[in-house]
Amino acid sequence: MNKHGQLSLSAGVQAFGICGCVCVALFSGGVNLASAQEAKTLTRFHDPVVVNTGILMGLPTRNTAGYRLYSVHQDVLSPIPFQFDERDDMGEIVFSETAAKNEFRLDENDELVFMAKDTGDRIATELLPATSDAAVEIEVTDPVTRARGWAYLLHFSGSMPPSSPVTYVRFDAETNQARTSLYTVDNYPGRNFFTGLRIAPALGGTDENILERMKLRVHPTFSLFLSTWSPLFTEEDFSVRIDGAKNGPVRAIRRVRQSLNLGQYFPDMPGGTAYTYYYFSSFMTPSTFSAPWLVLKALRDFEFVGVSEFRSSASEMTYRDAVNPQELTFSAQKNGAEAITGKDHDWYVVGGKHGTHLQAFMIPEQWKEWGILRGTVFRPEPPAAGYSLLNMTNLREPGNYKMNMIFVILTRPYHTGDEVQSLAMLKDPLRATVDRIK
């Protein structure tokens, strides 16, 4: 395993507390405590908390089987959903039978994952149960508001108390579908794009599929010596094979191996791996844009457009983004001409009677400094929304550039400012401090 694994985007772990010696069976339904030491103020709803296990110092054992995660709400200690995810020396997720069961030996670059919304109040050390032989407190902090929440990771060397019965998400590799209580996403077989998005009535949706498919257009132009090459690639040219899938209580992970079809006279070109992480109210796909020196020197033009094309039943839904704050309706043809398309923006929202979702597209800060923009794509017929990448010939340096695409199911019809909490997952990730308290 790699000692230099990446630190977490955000963090937190839970330990429980109870006064006196209490039998293990009590933990199945939660236990009443004395008053909490500090009340939770953290309000981040969508954020996963990903703790690099390298900071979990002083654990009595690195075997994951002996741990449970807890939080305190209204003076009651209860188990919350969590999982350990194993990563190898290269930082890749390990898809093994033991990892799937959440049982393996931790090293410095594995991850502990739970939801920020499940953190609770802080408890006094003396309230920790005698049935556990070790406890770690992780304080989760919003770097913007300084709001905090706490979670506690407890180790048991004897009989294990029950874990949380909650499972937030599941990915089915056979049907290529991810499902939570709030949304369902369908992936096209053998390709890396979506063909279905359903928002549950619990969040104002109808559970009807609003998405026809995602479409992609990549059209570079290269000039080398006396020749010019201008290939056109669409979403159909990028084939994938599911290389691994893991379902945990908190997140489901899908990894695919990608390849690019260069035409009938050429073999498919390997395109590396891509992950999608599914959480209870969101899913994200981090990616890497590779720009070798020779490609950069030969690049003369670059067109990129990626859109979600919606079904006709969604034509009454509305669109808005950071540079188009006014409501644009897909059914109004004039709105397509009125949309501002040439200014940079990092989010848009589509909403209506079928539910409301936000999509954010994050690019490297360097790109923005060089004048590369994420333009608006808004089309009334057929209804479609997405992004373009403008001024890509401004790329100045070769390298591998990190990007991220995230979908968030909003809890209500859009109100001004609702995007802030969703974007905070990527712009201002939660921070954590860890303390061994028993």
Give the role of each language-model region.
Residues 14-29:
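Bacterial N-terminal signal peptides
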Residues 1-12:
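N-terminal secretory signal peptides that target proteins for export/translocation
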Residues 122-239:
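Solvent-exposed N-terminal domain segments of exported/luminal and surface proteins
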Residues 16, 38-40, 101-103, 336-337, ...:
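Generic structural signal for short, flexible, solvent-exposed coil/loop and linker residues
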Residues 30-35:
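Sec/Tat signal peptide C-region and signal peptidase I cleavage site
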Residues 37-177:
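Alpha-mannosidase-like glycoside hydrolase catalytic domains involved in N-glycan trimming
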